[in-house]
């Protein structure tokens, strides 16, 4: 098997993981709404989905269309970083439990979670998102995708983090 086939399969596995996140998120949304939860700041979500979808599609497209090689000295460390990002992401999800969602949902009376990775960082999942957005494409030399994702994701995260901070302040009040 060629490295391109293996890389495409890996990106496919990441896509399946993202779909699993959607399933978990829908379950958590039902739980939150049953407790009075309300979704806020939905306007940025389509852009976030587009940027993340573009990351996965763009990485594979760049590798194939621009014939990006797998360079072991860069590829293997990037694979390890991407795996670490997945571990951090699921640590965040399991720490937040039913409070975690891909949407911004405010549940009245709920206290902020300060355990797991939230002991050290207010938004640890976004550390995983930022690092993974560089690691996944660079794993197979797709540096243009890494660069474009980083720029677009910075805009999306700026809006998203402001929204979450407002929501967290409202929930804590």
Language model features with spans:
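N-terminal signal-anchor/start-transfer transmembrane helix
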Residues: 11-25
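Cytosolic-biased juxtamembrane loops and peripheral soluble domains of multi-pass membrane proteins
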Residues: 24-44, 70-173
């Amino acid at each position: 098997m060629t490295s391109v086939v293996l890389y495409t399969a890996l990106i496919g596995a990441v896509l399946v993981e993202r779909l699993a996140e959607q399933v978990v998120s829908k379950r958590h949304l039902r739980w939150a709404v049953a407790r009075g939860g309300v979704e806020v700041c939905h306007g940025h979500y389509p852009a976030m989905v587009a940027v993340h979808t573009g990351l996965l599609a763009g990485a594979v497209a760049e590798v194939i269309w621009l014939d990006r090689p797998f360079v072991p000295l860069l590829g293997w460390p990037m694979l390890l970083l991407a795996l670490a990002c997945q571990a951090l992401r699921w640590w965040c999800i399991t720490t937040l439990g039913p409070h975690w969602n891909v949407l911004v949902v405010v549940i009245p009376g709920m206290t902020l979670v300060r355990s797991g990775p939230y002991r050290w960082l207010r938004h640890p999942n976004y550390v995983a998102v930022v690092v993974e957005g560089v690691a996944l494409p660079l794993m197979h030399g797709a540096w243009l995708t890494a660069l474009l994702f980083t720029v677009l994701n910075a805009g999306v995260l700026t809006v998203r983090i402001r929204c979450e901070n407002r929501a967290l302040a409202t929930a804590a009040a």
